[in-house]
Every structure is written in structure tokens, then in C-alpha cells.
Amino acid sequence: MFFQHSQLQNSDHLLHESMADSNHQSLSPPCANGHRSTISLRDDQGGTFCLICFSNLVSDPRIPTVHVSYALHQLSIAISEPIFLRTLLSSHIHFLVSPLVHALSSIDDAPIAIQIMDMISLLCSVEESSIGEDFVERISDQLSSGALGWSRRQLHMLHCFGVLMSCENININSHIRDKEALVCQLVEGLQLPSEEIRGEILFALYKFSALQFTEQNVDGIEVLSLLCPKLLCLSLEALAKTQRDDVRLNCVALLTILAQQGLLANSHSNSASSMSLDEVDDDPMQTAENVAARPCLNVLFAEAIKGPLLSTDSEVQIKTLDLIFHYISQESTPSKQIQVMVEENVADYIFEILRLSECKDQVVNSCLRVLDLFSLAEHSFRKRLVIGFPSVIRVLHYVGEVPCHPFQIQTLKLISSCISDFPGIASSSQVQEIALVLKKMLERYYSQEMGLFPDAFAIICSVFVSLMKTPSFGETADVLTSLQESLRHSILASLSLPEKDSTQILHAVYLLNEVYVYCTASTSINKTICIELRHCVIDVCTSHLLPWFLSDVNEVNEEATLGIMETFHSILLQNSDIQAKEFAELLVSADWFSFSFGCLGNFCTDNMKQRIYLMLSSLVDILLEQKTGSHIRDALHCLPSDPQDLLFLLGQASSNNQELASCQSAALLIFHTSSIYNDRLADDKLVLASLEQYIILNKTSLICAISDSPALLNLVNLYGLCRSLQNERYQISYSLEAERIIFHLLNEYEWDLGSINIHLESLKWLFQQESISKSLIYQIQKISRNNLIGNEVHNVYGDGRQRSLTYWFAKLISEGDNYAATLLVNLLTQLAEKEEQENDVISILNLMNTIVSIFPTASNNLSMNGIGSVIHRLVSGFSNSSLGTSFRTLLLLVFNILTSVQPAVLMIDESWYAVSIKLLNFLSLRDTAIKQNHEDMVVIGILSLVLYHSSDGALVEASRNIVSNSYLVSAINTVVDVACSKGPALTQCQDETNIGEALAFTLLLYFFSLRSLQIVLAGAVDWQTFFGTSTSLETLPVVCIHCHNLCRLMHFGAPQIKLIASYCLLELLTGLSEQVDIKKEQLQCSSSYLKSMKAVLGGLVFCDDIRVATNSALCLSMILGWEDMEGRTEMLKTSSWYRFIAEEMSVSLAMPCSASSTYVNHHKPAVYLTVAMLRLKNKPVWLRTVFDESCISSMIQNLNGINISREIVILFRELMQAELLNSQQVTKLDRAFQECRKQMHRNGTRDETVEEQVQRKIPSIHDHSEFCNYLVHLMVSNSFGHPSESETYTQKKKQILDEMEQFSELISTREGRVSPIQEETRQMQTERIV
């Protein structure tokens, strides 16, 4: 039986205990039998132990066993005493060997035998004693001689021999006299039927074999080698027959050590015939035929291990699995052994162990180690693996949870092998289960929660690829989701982990490529998820793989580089996909052309060159959208790897060399495509030199190939770009001959600028060349025609973006450093002279409208190049009977130009005056002023813009003609009279008829007329006449709408009419107020007239449109001021409406919710009106009641840096002027304004580009509301009392600070001191000066 070392009793400590003095033990007296005292030992209790008596007792078989047992027990007790033990060891220890061995060999009583073996073991364990070697010698002799025969006594001897060989302090080999005889006797004993004896023999053989190989004892090893064939056969037979786990364990241990030393492999290599003859010689009872009929060793081994594999003892199973592993792995060619074991169903037993193992680590590891070897027999093992597939999946769960599990790789290999060999074996639930486990492994690997072996990472990627090929893979969305997440984790882990290597990246990219192939295949089941998967692949490439690849390309080997490029190429091949287009643009924005040639420099192989040029050709197909990448593919075999070599080829004559011509076409295409994306493959000087050489040497072929316009224009783009960069960066010489040839080709042959992709700088260079003006005019006409039909081509590249040719052409015109504006105006002039090409005129006018809409500043260059004269010529050619689309388009252009042109430009171009007069005359010839059509509305809008520009000193004479035009005076009065006559029905009439549009344009024209009057008729207008009655209209020299009519329109009109009429009234009253102030006049109107106006305006103070409410409050404030000057404010003392307005405002500002600036702005009209009442000489008494101490204190309490506006500061200043603030409130206000000022300085100046007003653009439309809305915007942004939308934060802040400064000056004036704000202002000014 096999014993662990821990089972051995150890008494070494006995010799290390305290011992008495050496003289302590005196000589013992003779024993009762008269034996000498020298062989008698005294114990600590005073007793005497005679060794001869003990020997006679244990050796005599006639002595009762109880006496023997007692003697052994007494000896055991005595030995436990240190002095006794020391005396025994010093003189008499060897006297015990013979009697104990004799007793062990002659006693059948098991308990006595056990006592004897324990005694022997105890004696041998003492380090200072050599008695163990005597026991080994005597027992081995007994076993070698075979004198005892195979009996139960022999069992005790075998067991004792095994125990002795387990003692480490005994030199076993040197005291076994005849190793061959001993081993022969033991091997023969294996044929005995007793399982106990076989177990002890196997244990003894195991210990003997282990000892020989450990000490490398040549004799012992030779004996084992000679007897190994027979030993192997008998051991396997014993293993196959036994049902005892202890016997199995000993046998497996013996076979394992033989297998580890290669003896099993050597035995297997011997031929069956020689083995049989040896056995015949050894055993005459066997014939050669009988031996030959026995099963071969591999089959015997397979049958023998099945029993241990079925054992319920996990230790037996583990040891057996280890035996299988060593048995197979020691073979130089183990395929035959594996084949036999698989055919004998050993794999099925192992899978069953896995199924029942409950994922115990040792069992799982041993099973996986053997199964990994079995997988070498691919053909036979596949079928067995299918049976055990569920068990392997269960193990995968366990392995996937353990970081760097030692058999991680083996498990994954089994999964991969089964799925790849039998794609249909995995059900949808199993596929989902596997995908989820692998996803978690990759996720934890990326997060560094667990480790993965490099091979394990590769197999996981391979398993996913195999899973994608299974029929049930795409049946559930969860599987594809797991794949999507796994893909992302695998790439990120490969790129970001410290231990990244190119091999791992290669496998991750392989998975990425296969996933993309799967999700783009037509056989994919879940189309929606596949689209998401494809997007995921592209996102991973763009967000992670591409940036890493571009930055760390030198760390990637060639194979990984090819794999990454293959994936990128696969995406590009889906050129119909929007994301493929975006990916291509991302590549070129990262200088992919330069990067590709850099890769060719690192890996100059045919595979790399082919991959790069094919990818570049696909990139060109997508970017240029003309399938021109075929030029690169056609010349693939002869293209060089260096851009410098491409330039060299480009500079050669190729008229007689088709292969060279093909290379040159590809080179031109590559340099052209890279250049439009600002990717420089070579120095511009070298490129220009090669291009010039190419042009000069191949001018004949260029002329012959002029039909291939894209190829020519690729050359033009490259040439123009190099020339433009040469002008910008440095001055270098260039070939006049090459330039002449290029200009000749462009002037003499037809080409289309919109048919190719071109760089902005190249386009700009072309339009700077006066020599090709004729050809450029033709190109402009093509651009206009494409723009007219909406067939714009986005083929110009600049500022890192691809835009339409029209857009960049507009930019050229706005910049003005080229002939684009001049050529465009000249083209329109030519068409105007011909007078029969209306469609061409319309296309050019539409193009100009588009240009001005894109870049409003282009209006200035168009005007400076004479567009006004051309427009005047066109307008003069129209009559009422010949109006058409061209006239409407022309009016739109005039409107657009006047919205964006600078007044200074209009001042130097007299043609705009003529245009204005023509349009005014056109309007005067219309039949009616009410039923205005589209042209009438636009003309009125244009006249309004002319009046608007007069405020800045431009078109003053034209404006004077407009405001004094008798037709306009009559038409405006007619429209207003009709509208006012409707009364309350005006709103309904506006919805049902065109009176609303006519009235809106009429009021807008009137507003800009009022603003222009002080410029064009300075001092000649009596503003008092605007208070007159309607009967005096014909006596007025200018356009006029009386105040009461404006009030009617404000009261009854629609929201837009209310708004425009309110601005007209505000403008009118402002002019009147200035006249009254300057001339110190009195109002020439009755009190009832003003009362009716105040009734309307007072009601509109609470209008929903804050602009109308503000205008009404401002108008009402001016009227109250006039009345106050004449002492007509008695009605305020009793007016409950004005008091209600003031109370509503004060209560609202005193509420805590007024902290919002929006809420304060809502009450701005009431603030204006309240300020006006506070400024009256005869203030209403109730103001003091409204603004009592508690109300004002609450208002001050609510002030903060957000809601303090210019109006709020004015309000409190007027309250202080009216003595409604006490000193404490003034102090609090002063402190609040100081905090607000500090906060403004802390915030600094905001980015004024955020505040910058974007120029409004009028597209080519026929909706009157667009024109009207623009004019309303223009009116609102330039009206009194309303800050312009272009007003910056800094300007608004300055207004508030100025009002605070005035408030502080008022405080200092009243108190005779310098305010803190004034002092702070002085300090800041001093700091700025310093």
C-alpha cells in the first residue's frame, strides 16, 4: 500500500531531549534467566530490559501472542526514554534486527505484525542510528530469496519494506544485495490473485523505481528497463482487474514514474514478437501463439485506465489523468497512442469526469491537459469532442472567471476546434452562452481585472470568427451585441495595454476584418443589428485604430500593418455607404497618402506595395467619385515605392511607351488627389519642375488626349497649385514654355471646371491669369447654368473642407484679388448687349444672387466692377409688357446688393442713382397702389433700402426724389385711407385681401422716408404738419401719414402692422420733439387730439409685443413732456390708468421673482413711462404713495448683477431727483451699483464674435414675407430706443456704467463728495495710463 511520508512515525526528537548524566545508569544485574548484565538495560523506572530474553520471546512461535505484544509495548515505552534510547543506540541496537525480522516473517497475527513494523519504523527514524540499513538488507534478502512464499506473512514484509524505502535517512540502494532478484520476485508476485499483495508489491515497486531514478542508480535502472515489458503488462492487467482505489493509486503511481522516465515508450517500441518470445522463455506454460493473441499495449493501457477514471476518488482520477498525459507526451510520435485511446472511448470518460467535476481546479486542469493532447488526433477526436461539447462550455465558464488560468488556452482551443469543425453543432443558446463568456473575458482583460495569455487572446478572436460562421449566430440580438462589445474591447486592449504586441494587434484586426465582412454580407440575418455592427467597426477604426496606427506605425510589424490596411480597404470598398465616404475623408485629412508611402519605406515588399496602391485606388474612387482609381490599378505592377521615383517617371517622354504613360497617369492622379487635401508627397519645387518637364516633353500627347478632360485638369490643378504656393511662400523660376502650353490648352480646347476636383488655391490662381479670361468666362457661364438648375458639384477643396464650386467662386469675388468679379460683370454685360439670351441672363443673375447670399461682402466688389451700370442697362430694357422672370431675378439681385453693400461704395458709383430713378418711374407707371404684385413689393423694398443708405450719405439725391415723388405721396395716402376706413375690420381684411402686404410695405417705405427726411430735406420739413387733418394731404411736399392714422393702425392693425406703425410714430414724434426743442415751438394741435393719441398709446403699454409696448411708452413719454411744458398735465393727478401702470411696475420690481433680467425687460415700457412722469414739473401726488419707503426698499433688495439694466439705473436716478429716496436707500443703491460694477470688470469682455450680428441673406424666393421681415429687422435694429442686435456686450456694459456714473455724480453733487464709483473710475484710468 502507498504511504505518504506524513504517515511515518518520527521519534528523532527523543534524542534531543534532556539527558541525565552519563554515570546515571549503573550496570544492570543479570536477568532471571542468567543472561549477562551487559546485554541488559535499565530504564528510568528502575526496571531491567534483557535483550536476549526479548529476542527469544519474539522469535519463539510457541509464545502466546499476548506476551509478544506486551514485550513490544514495553520496548516501545523504554525507547521513549532518552537515556535508555542513547544506551541502546550506543551498544546494542543491532541486536534487535534479527529477532524483529524473524518475528515479522513468522507471525500471522496482523496486530502483532503492525506492532513490529511500528517498532522497526521507530528505530529506523532515529538519525544517529544505522539500524535501518540492516533492516533493509535482511528484508530485501528475504523478499529476493522467495523463501517465505507468497503468504500473508509476505504481505507484512512487503509493507515493512515499503515503509523502509520511505525513510529518507536510509541508504536503500547500497544495502539491497540483489536488485534483479528482488525486482523479479516482486514482478512475479503481481500474478498472485490477492489484491492486497498486489497493492503492496506495486507500492514497493513504485518506491524502488522512484529511488533508482532519483539517485540515478545505473544498476537499478537497468534492471527496471529489462523487466519493464513484463512489469508493464502485469501492472496494466492488475490495474484493469482491481476494484480497490488504494491498489489503483499504487499502480498508477508506478506507471507514472515509468512513463516519466520513458520506459513505457521504450517498451512500446519493442516488437510484439520479441516480447512474446521473452515471455515464452520465462514461462514455458505459455506458447508464442497465446502471447501474440494478447491485446497490444496501447489497447491494454486504454482498457486498464478506464477503471481508475470511473473511480469516485478524485485523487485516483487526477493521478490517472496525469499518467495518461505522461504516457502520451513521452512518445516521439504519439498519434498512434492517441488514436487508440480515442477509439477506445477514453475521451468520453474524461468528458464525463469534466461534467461531474463541479469545476474543481485540479480535476479540470488534468482533464484539459489530456484533452489538449487528444486534440492532436484531429479526425478521430472531432466526433468525441462533439459529445463532450456541453461539458467544455461549462468548464469555459469557470476558466473565464479565473485570471490567467493555466488551462485557459486548452479550453478555448477545444471550443474553437469544435465550432470550426462542426459549425452546426452549437445551438443558439450555446452560441449566446459562449459569446457572453468571451465578451466578459475581453472586457475584464481590457480593464486589467484579469490577464490573458497571448495565445488565449488569439484563440478568442478565432472563436468569434468561427461563431460567425455558425447557422444560429445571428438569431438573437444579444449575440451580435456581445460581438460588438467584444470587438471594441479587443481592439482597445491591443492598443492600450502596456504589454501590447503586434501579434495581439494582428489577431484583433483579423477579428475586426471578419466582423466587417460578416455584417456586410447579404446572408446576415439581423439587418438592423448588422448595420449597428458595421457602424461600430467604422467607429472603432476612426476613433481608436486609425489614430494609434498613424502615431505608432514604427512599432507595428508588416503582417499587422497589412491586416490593418486590409480592414481599412474593406471599408472603402463599400463606397456606396455614407460612412465609407466619411472614413475616406478622415483618411486623407490625416495625410494618408504620405503615411502610405512611409509604410512602403518601412516594408518595401510586393505585398505591401500591392495593398497600398490598391487601397489608394479605392480611396481615389470614393473621393473623386469618377471611378478614376482604375488608372492606379492598371499601372500597379510598374509603380515604384517612392514618390521621388514617381516624379522621375513623370518627367519622362512617354509618347512611344504605353507602360510609362500608364505610370504617369497614375502618378498625376496620386499627386492630384493628395494635393487637394493638402497632403504634400514631395517638395513643391520638385513637383513643379517635374510637371513642367512632363508638359514640355509630352505636349503632343496632351493635345491628342484633350478629350480626356479630367486627366488634363488634374494636371492643371497640380500646376496651378504649385504656382500659387510658389507665389505665396517663395519666388522660384518657372518655365514660360510650360505656362504657354497650359494656357494654350485651356484657351483652345473645351474643358469643364466643374467636372474635376480642384484645390481652392489652384482655382484662385486660374482666376488671377488674365491670359485665359476668355476661357474663364465660358467656365463662369457653365457655373451659372449649373447653379440655375441646382446641379452644383462639390468639387473644390479649401480650408480643410469640400464645398461647391459656386461657394468658392463667391469667395474669390468677395476677396477681390483676382479677375472673378470683373469677368462675371463682363459676362453679364455681354449678355445684356445681345438682348436675346434671357435664360443666360437669368442664370448669371441667379449666380450673383447666390454669391451675394453666401458672401455679402461680394456686393462691394461687384459694385466696384460696374454691376450698377449693367443693372441700369437691363432695367432700361424692360417695359411693363415685357416683364418676366429675368426682371424679377434682377430686382432680387438689386435688393440683395443693397442689403450688403457699403455706403462708401455707393457714393462713388453714380449708376445706382439711375437705377433708383428707373425703378421709381417703373412704380409710378403702375395702375393701382393697393393691388400690388410681386415686382411692386420688391421695388418698394428696394426704394426703402435706398432711403436707408441715405442716412449714411449715400444715394441722397435718389432719396430726395423718392420722398418727394407725387405718385408715392398719393399711393401711400390711398393705401392708408383704405386701411383706416376698415376700422375694427382691418384685421379681417388683412387676412382675406392683399391690403395687408401693401400696407406693410407702404409703412416700411414711410418709416425709412422719415429717417431720410432730415438728411435729404434738412430743415425744410415742418414736423408740425404731421398733426394735420387728412384734408391737407395734397399740400404736403413729401410722403406723409398723420399721427392719428398711425394710431388707428396701431390700434386696429395686425401684429406686424402694429409694430411697423409704432416705429413710424416713434420716428415721427422724435423728429417733432427735436424741432420743438430747437425752435422752442408750441404744439399746433388740440388737447383732444393728444388725448385720443394718449388713449391708444396708453392701452398699448401692456401689448404682448414688447417692442410695440416700448414704442408706445416712449411716444407717450414725449407727449407728456410736451404737455408738461405747456402746463396741461392736470389729468395725470386723477388718472387711474397712469397710476395703475406705475403701481404694476413698482409692485412687480419689488417682488423677489424680479431677479430675472427677462422679467425686468418685460416691465421696461412701464419704466420709461414712469421715468417720464417723474421728470414732470407738476408730478402727480400719488407717485409718492406708489413709491413709498417699503416698496423702494424691496426694489433695491432685489437688485443684483443680472437684472441691473440701463433703464433701472435711470429709474432710481429719477426717484432720487424726485426726493423719493431716503439717505439709507441711496447708500444701499450706491453699494449695489458698486458691486455690479466690480462684477462687470471681473467678467471682463466677452468674446465679441459671439455677439457679432450675422448678415441676413435673402435667397432666391418669391415670398413677400421674406423681404418684409428683412426690412422690419432693419427698421428695428436702427430705431430710437431699441439697441441694435449687433450691439456688443461691451457696448451695453458701457451704457450701464455711464448711467451709474451719472447716478454717482448726482449723489456727490447733492452731498458735496466724490462717490466711490468715481474714485474707482479714476484709479482704473490711472492704471491704464501707467
Swiss-Prot record:
UniProtKB keywords: DNA-binding, Hydrolase, Meiosis, Nucleus
Disordered: region residues: 1310-1330
Disulfide topology: none
Tissue spec. comment: Expressed in flower buds.
Compartmental location: Nucleus
Any one annotated GO CC term: nucleus
Gene Ontology molecular function: DNA binding; hydrolase activity
Key word Nucleus present: yes
GO terms of biological process kind: meiotic DNA double-strand break formation
Effect of gene knockout: Plants exhibit reduced fertility and meiotic defects. Drastic decrease in chiasma formation at metaphase I associated with an absence of synapsis in prophase, due to the inability to make double-strand breaks (DSB).
InterPro entries from the UniProt entry: ARM-type_fold, PRD1
Keyword Flavoprotein among record annotations: no
Function (record text): Involved in DNA cleavage that forms the double-strand breaks (DSB) that initiate meiotic recombination.
Oligomeric and partner information: Interacts with SPO11-1. According to PubMed:28855712, may interact with SPO11-2; this is in contradiction with PubMed:9461215 which claims that it seems to not interact with SPO11-2. Binds to DFO, PRD3 and MTOPVIB. Facilitates an interaction between PRD3 and DFO.
Domain statement: The N-terminal domain (1-802) but not the C-terminal domain (755-1330) is essential for interaction with SPO11-1.
PANTHER family found in the cross-reference section: PROTEIN PRD1, PUTATIVE RECOMBINATION INITIATION DEFECT 1-RELATED
Name of the protein this chain belongs to: Protein PUTATIVE RECOMBINATION INITIATION DEFECT 1
Gene from which this protein is expressed: PRD1
